[in-house]
Amino acid sequence: MPTVLALETSCDESAAAVLRLNNGCLQVIASRIASQVEKHAQWGGVVPEVASRLHVEALPHLVEEVLQEAGQSMARFDAVAATVTPGLAGALMVGSVTGRSLAALHALPFFGIHHLEGHLASVRLAEHPPRPPYLVLLVSGGHTELIRVGAESEMVRLGRSHDDAAGEAFDKVGRLLGLAYPGGPAIQALAATGDSGRFSLPKGRVSKPGGGFHPYDFSFSGLKTAMLRLVQALSEADEDLPRADLAASFEQVVADVLVERSLLCANDQGLKTVVMVGGVAANRRLRELMSKRGQEQGIEVHTAPLRYCTDNAAMIGAAALQRLVSGVNGSSLELGVAARWPLDKTEVLYHSPPPF
């Protein structure tokens, strides 16, 4: 039963987990997350230098806690994994150095994991995970992408956001409405009492140079601007700001756009399964709408378990175990970190010399 210790420090969540593969099923033996949300809330967003310092403070304790809970000594692991890209460089370095050091000290393979590959693997932590091929809507604070996942770790991006990710749009609109950071949960709570049809908002589209639109791509900057102008107009008219209706209308149009383009892409690709992963995949309205419209179109919808939608180390361990059992020997201990790296080039993370 292959077992890994996994670390995640790509942004503002410090996390450690122990995972085991038992008869083809992933088992999360222990998982711990130290959130930095309260620390960053006073600035309305993540401060990279603060995030790095908090990772340094939290990660050793998290590793100790998961080892104790798992009742596992380092000698009994088959590998150590850590996120190495993409993310905040300083934050990534904390997890990467910790992971590589533990691997070197205990003569274990080290797996440098692409953060998005971790999100894609998070659905494998569900009780009944889907089998590829399928289309993944990866929707989080930093990413909004449509990715076809096939056998043998095949990952092909078919759609993306050309500006803000959906999660960024939630945060920015949340600030506009005077809500707490992060914006996603705050907007969802407020929208529950609002009228989602009160305000008409644009579904941003991305033009092609030769005319027409990219059918599977996203743009949320126009929606964000429309919300700003709407709030300004209501304020200038001395109206009481209908924050619940504004939140509900915004949440609805985001969900509509994500669902419509995901299902269009799946149908065009001949795929009968759509998977949702990432922090925004925890949004209740999005989950319900995708399930309803997917059922209407004969498309099966799977979502990563709620506790594994936001950043966590269990998904990093899941990705590492996939690589380990497929015969990958691991990454070089000289592998560094990169703030950006394309998902379709993850294979080179396991080559020598390392790409960065």
Swiss-Prot record:
Its EC number is 2.3.1.234. Disulfide bonds: none annotated. GO terms for biological process: tRNA threonylcarbamoyladenosine modification. Signal peptide: none annotated. Fe cation binds at H115, H119, D311. InterPro entries: ATPase_NBD, Gcp-like_dom, KAE1/TsaD, TsaD. It holds the Pfam family TsaD. Keywords: Acyltransferase, Cytoplasm, Iron, Metal-binding, Transferase, tRNA processing. Coiled coil: none annotated. Binds 1 Fe(2+) ion per subunit. It catalyses: L-threonylcarbamoyladenylate + adenosine(37) in tRNA = N(6)-L-threonylcarbamoyladenosine(37) in tRNA + AMP + H(+). The keyword Aminoacyl-tRNA synthetase does not apply. It is found in: Cytoplasm. Substrate binds at L138, V139, S140, G141, G142, D171, G184, N283. It is an enzyme of class 2 (transferase). It comes from the Bacteria. One of its GO terms (cellular component) is cytoplasm. One of its GO terms (molecular function) is N(6)-L-threonylcarbamoyladenine synthase activity. Its cofactor is Fe(2+). Belongs to the KAE1 / TsaD family. Required for the formation of a threonylcarbamoyl group on adenosine at position 37 (t(6)A37) in tRNAs that read codons beginning with adenine. Is involved in the transfer of the threonylcarbamoyl moiety of threonylcarbamoyl-AMP (TC-AMP) to the N6 group of A37, together with TsaE and TsaB. TsaD likely plays a direct catalytic role in this reaction. PANTHER family: TRNA N6-ADENOSINE THREONYLCARBAMOYLTRANSFERASE (PTHR11735), TRNA N6-ADENOSINE THREONYLCARBAMOYLTRANSFERASE, MITOCHONDRIAL (PTHR11735:SF6). NCBIfam families: gcp_kae1, T6A_TsaD_YgjD. This is tRNA N6-adenosine threonylcarbamoyltransferase. The gene is tsaD.
